[in-house]
Curated annotation (Swiss-Prot):
Name of the protein this chain belongs to: 3-dehydroquinate dehydratase
Gene Ontology biological-process entries: amino acid biosynthetic process; aromatic amino acid family biosynthetic process; chorismate biosynthetic process; quinate catabolic process
Organism: Prochlorococcus marinus (strain SARG / CCMP1375 / SS120)
Pathway where this protein functions: Metabolic intermediate biosynthesis; chorismate biosynthesis; chorismate from D-erythrose 4-phosphate and phosphoenolpyruvate: step 3/7
Alphabetized UniProt keyword annotations: Amino-acid biosynthesis, Aromatic amino acid biosynthesis, Lyase
Reaction(s) this enzyme catalyzes, per UniProt: 3-dehydroquinate = 3-dehydroshikimate + H2O
Family according to the record: Belongs to the type-II 3-dehydroquinase family.
Length: 149
């Protein structure tokens, strides 16, 4: 089984960017820990980050037929990008939306997601652990789909 982790704008600055909101772990460390966990679960994990909307769309489209699920922290694009939504829906790849912070306890503009209604699940507010929970959720979803439960 293969998953793709996509991180959007400004997530490359984790560890320095507003640590009271996003925590002190770097994206590199989060990805390393998630890859270790994925390997233990028998999942190959590819990681990708970009600050560019078009590059993220290209990445999603290129995943078609290559991955079983997408874990996506679209950052601010969560609230604004019809292009990311359309790319995710056009591939038909199941995806989990995830966020480090609890977006529902923040500014009103962060409380609306253009991705959430079609995601297989949403994980928000658990800091770096949100990534691990998203991995677990996607894996459980795919296993239940295969077993028909």
């Amino acid at each position: 089984m293969k998953f793709l982790l996509i991180n959007g704008p400004n997530l490359n600055l984790l560890g320095q960017r507003e640590p009271l909101i996003y925590g002190s772990e770097t994206l590199e460390k989060i990805e390393l820990n998630l890859k270790k966990k994925a390997k233990l679960l028998g999942v190959e994990l590819e990681c990708f980050q970009s600050n560019s909307e078009g590059t993220l769309v290209d990445c999603i489209q290129q995943a078609l037929g290559k991955v079983d699920a997408i874990l996506i922290n679209a950052g601010a694009y969560t609230h604004t990008s019809v292009a990311l939504r359309d790319a995710l829906l056009s591939t038909g790849i199941p995806y989990v939306e995830l966020h480090l912070s609890n977006t529902h306890s923040r500014e009103s503009f962060r409380q609306k997601s253009l991705l959430a209604d079609r995601a297989i699940g949403i994980v928000s507010g658990f800091g770096a652990m949100s990534y691990s929970l998203a991995l677990d959720g996607a894996l459980d979803f795919l296993k239940s789909q295969k077993s028909g439960v």
